[in-house]
Amino acid sequence: LDTTMKTNFKNISILALLAMTLVMMSCGGEKKRKDGRTDTTTQGEISFACDESFSPIIDELVEVYHMQCPNTKLKPIYTNEIDGINMLLQQKTWLTITARNFTPKEYTYVKDGLNMLPEAVRLAYDGMALICNNQNLDSCITVNDIKAILLGKKTKWSEVNPGSKLGEIWVCFDNRKSSAVNYCCDSILGGKPIDSPNVFAAKDSKDVIDYVASTPNAIGVIGSNWLNDKRDSTNTTWNKAIRVMSVSKLDKATPYNSWKPYQAWLLNGRYPFVRTIWALLNDPKRGLPWGFAHFIESPKGQLILFKAGLLPTRGEITIRDVQVHNQ
């Protein structure tokens, strides 16, 4: 009897050990995939690429997502547009937030070359803002003037406004490979390269603002979300040395036909330089990158974008004209 009991006990122990091993293997298979990822939409840690010009609003969205899903950790890598998209194509990240969609060649590469399904999520619209020093009285400018300046056909302020004494025009971008540079070449210049000796690139949007604040004859090119970054004293809302330029589609710019990159003028088409913010995904597992991108396009994410001064892509938006009558 003792021998039988020992044998049975031994068999039971072996079966229990096998069962525990199978459970552990099963759990491990669910938590850790073949690619090493363990993230889901509500837990885990990932890095993602983002155009530096969107850093103020992305920081805010990440903060809200962390509060909503406390078991997640999102780490944005702020870079330029070209490097950010290359990171996605090289599978160094599963999400890139930038100012353009996949090109047909990029889409085909991800779909056929990597055997994955690329996804592009339209998040919001922002304006390509032009800022100048507060000492510059020429705060209204035409689209044609901007084209001529970027092509090097106009290099002095007196060629824009005959009465100006500011001298040469210096144009500062955030990065030579940024979405702002690409937007100007593709959308403003119709595919032509910037060809002016007076155009240069700084390190980032903050440096552009600092440069314009200290240079009376400069124009800075930044994303309009920097106009409302209330956490940073260098932003144009609080920086009294900076003013936002108004842009006109007509041949002569006046305060009555020129518009700034604010939501109402983006919506009705009066401001000419509008770009789309995209979330480009290569996330077949639909994990944390997918969850964060679709959080931004959710009603809560769209409201955050709206309060930050961007124009959401989803939801009904009504801009009402208010008439004030003197009594």
Language-model regions: role of each:
Residues 1-4:
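Short, Lys/Arg-enriched N-terminal segments with co-localized hydrophobic residues
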Residues 6-16:
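Bacterial N-terminal signal peptides that target proteins for export
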Residues 28-77, 81-82, 86-89, 121-124, ...:
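Exported/periplasmic ABC-transporter solute-binding proteins
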Residues 81-113, 228-232:
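Pocket-flanking alpha-helical
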Residues 115-119:
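Periplasmic N-terminal soluble interaction domains immediately after the signal peptide in Gram-negative
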